[in-house]
UniProtKB/Swiss-Prot annotation:
The family this protein is said to belong to: Belongs to the acyl carrier protein (ACP) family.
GN (gene name): acpP
Source species: Oceanobacillus iheyensis (strain DSM 14371 / CIP 107618 / JCM 11309 / KCTC 3954 / HTE831)
Identification of the protein by name: Acyl carrier protein
Molecular functions per Gene Ontology: acyl binding; acyl carrier activity
Compartments reported by the entry: Cytoplasm
Domain called Carrier: residue spans: 2-77
Gene3D superfamilies cross-referenced by the UniProt entry: ACP-like
Xref: InterPro entries: ACP (IPR003231), ACP-like_sf (IPR036736), PP-bd_ACP (IPR009081)
HAMAP family in the record: Acyl_carrier
GO CC terms of this entry: cytosol; membrane
Claim: Transferase is one of the keywords in the record: no
Length: 77
């Protein structure tokens, strides 16, 4: 799980230009990391590419925190 978190964290830092210390499992994309809805869509697309998977739209809507993304990826691995 740590490896997935590290990869997700790196993508978030690059995409949202946030400090590494802000990216925690509990961090909300919108509330804590100042991402707008377009940022979240782009993050989901980048996660799909990074982890070679497809994230259904209805599943993507449920990914609100870094932890949600990590848990989703781990559940599909």
């Amino acid at each position: 799980m740590a490896e997935v978190f590290d990869r997700v964290k790196e993508i978030i830092i690059d995409r949202l230009d946030v400090e590494e210390s802000k990216v925690t499992m509990e961090a909300s994309f919108k509330d804590d990391l100042d991402a707008d809805s377009l940022d979240v869509v782009e993050l989901v697309m980048e996660l799909e590419d990074e982890f070679d998977m497809e994230i259904a739209d209805e599943d993507a809507e449920k990914i609100n925190t870094v932890g949600d993304a990590v848990d989703y990826i781990n559940s599909k691995a």
